[in-house]
Amino acid sequence: VAFCNAELVRGIDLFLDLVSFDEKIKNANIIITGEGKIDSQVKYGKAIKGIIERAKNIPIIAITGKIEGDLKELAESLGLTSIITMTHLGMKESYALKNASKILFDTSIQIANLIKNLCSNC
């Protein structure tokens, strides 16, 4: 690093800068993002942490494949408005992995319908 006058940056910061994330969320009312697994490790550098840090008080809904820990406590400690898991109680992990795209699509439709109904008078 010292030989090339390079600078170390977090991968998520590099990516968010490349896609002009801050500019794109400037007028956002809500951010919907995803993370494979949400647990106490998020605060130590998972990609979603960079999104949370840049959200600037914009509500964030996180879609996740797996949650480890108390849902309410995780949401509050991380600064997330809501955490929605794609896997339902009793769903086998092998089924969830095999059908991830359909489950994500169905989950996204549910979130869109919720936002539409909540904001119908906004």
Predicted feature locations:
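N-terminal loops that bind phosphate or other acidic moieties
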Residues: V1-C122
